[in-house]
Design a protein with these regions (language model features):
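DUTPase catalytic domain/fold
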Residues: 1-146
């Protein structure tokens, strides 16, 4: 599948996979800004995507984020196929002191998150009076044990 990408910044880096068999490809930082009032770090990628219709781009944190005092703000970002703006990643700064001691988290050229582009099915919801019975039933949080 071909996905068109527009560079919005001179120093934008095209997404890359670390290994040919990786599901996700890394997105790179071009610049950052911090909103201290909200304890948020905004990372720009300097790129916009033309994701094919019937697909969505899912933005996930990289595993290396475990070494930083940051959390991807919305856990998983969803980039719809009709969005043409810059893809950015917003992080919550969980420890301001550690963030400052580690030189601010991310810098231009750093890999900040990963994107996976997946197809999604057409779905039609149908209202029902009853749902089929399963072993789990209405068991919610923690109902299946540890």
């Amino acid at each position: 599948m071909k996905v068109r990408i527009k560079r919005l910044s001179e120093n934008a880096i095209m997404p890359k996979r670390a290994h040919a068999t990786d599901a996700g490809f890394d997105l790179y930082c071009t610049e950052t800004s911090v909103d201290w009032a909200k304890q948020e770090l905004l990372c720009h990628t300097g790129i916009a995507f033309e994701i094919p219709e019937g697909h969505a781009g899912l933005i996930f944190p990289r595993s290396s984020i475990a070494n930083k005092p940051l959390l991807l703000h919305n856990s998983v970002g969803v980039i719809d196929s009709n969005y043409r703006g810059e893809v950015t990643a917003k992080f919550i700064i969980t420890d301001a002191r550690e963030f400052l001691q580690n030189d601010g988290g991310y810098h231009s050229g750093d890999r900040i998150c990963q994107m996976i582009i997946l197809p999604y099915p057409e779905i039609e919801f149908e209202e029902a009076e009853e749902l089929s019975v399963t072993d789990r039933g209405k068991g919610g949080y923690g109902s299946t044990g540890r």
